[in-house]
């Protein structure tokens, strides 16, 4: 996701390669990033943050303690930490880095192609201008929604953060179902992918609610109605709700666990 951010910023010319420095312990990764984007690369977190307006934390939760230790005492008062580390709370970041200007965001994987959505929040010390900058950075990857309460970040994780996996799972099931009907897998994948893509675009452009669009497709006594009956009898809505509640609970658990 860190690469998604820098790629989006460079593609949309919101900054220049010289404005970006990345710290990574993996030599092949550093070599790739330097060649691909022309940015500065280093293994030293302290060097990477020098003269940067925003310090992006794009590391796995288990690597957060080491990263925060490197940042402690090195950040200038006007620098902002933008964390996309899943399940890592603002309190954890603030305590570890000894810093109070923090933006916490939860993007999702479609950000890699500029079609993501990020939920985010910020501490009260983050200025209006810095919030605008955070909005610009996150918006470069797609859309963004600001929340006053950090608790919503766990909910965002359950909806849009984990959401792509839900759609992949449903797509898998539809593809397998099409194969069972007799289609070869290539044709099954094409039918399902274009149906999902077209439906998403139609839902985005139509003023109608999803339920109304569904009813438009569902003729009384027809094939779609029969399929919908099976979904409803199997408790699809309840299953989806239960899954999202479980994801939200897990996000809270991860936030309560010291990384």
Model features per residue range: what roles?
Residues 27-28, 37, 45-120:
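Rossmann-like NAD(P)(H) cofactor-binding subdomain of soluble oxidoreductases
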Residues 93-101, 117-155, 166-205:
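Internal alpha-helical scaffold of NAD(P)-dependent oxidoreductase catalytic cores
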């Amino acid at each position: 996701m860190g690469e998604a951010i820098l790629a989006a910023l460079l593609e949309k010319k919101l900054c220049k390669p010289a404005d970006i420095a990345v710290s990574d312990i993996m030599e092949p990764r550093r070599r790739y990033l330097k060649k691909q984007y022309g940015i500065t690369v280093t293994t030293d977190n302290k060097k990477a943050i020098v003269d940067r307006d925003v310090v992006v934390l794009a590391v796995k939760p288990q690597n957060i303690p080491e990263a925060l230790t490197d940042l402690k005492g090195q950040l200038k008062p006007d620098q902002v930490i933008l964390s996309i580390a899943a399940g890592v709370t603002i309190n954890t970041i603030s305590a570890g880095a000894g810093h109070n200007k923090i933006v916490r965001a939860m993007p999702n994987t479609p950000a890699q192609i500029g079609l993501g959505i990020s939920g985010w929040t910020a501490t009260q010390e983050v200025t209006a201008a810095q919030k605008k900058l955070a909005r610009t950075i996150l918006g470069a990857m797609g859309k963004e929604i600001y929340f006053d309460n950090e608790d919503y970040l766990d909910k965002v994780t359950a909806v849009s953060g984990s959401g792509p996996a839900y759609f992949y799972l449903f797509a898998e099931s539809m593809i397998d179902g099409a194969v069972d009907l007799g289609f070869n897998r290539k044709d099954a994948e094409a039918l399902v992918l274009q149906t999902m893509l077209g439906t998403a675009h139609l839902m985005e452009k139509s003023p109608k609610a999803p339920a109304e669009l569904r009813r438009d497709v569902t003729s009384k006594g027809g094939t779609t109605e029969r399929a919908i009956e099976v979904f409803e009898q199997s408790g699809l809505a309840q299953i989806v709700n239960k899954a999202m509640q479980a994801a939200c609970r897990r996000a809270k658990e991860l936030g309560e666990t010291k990384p």
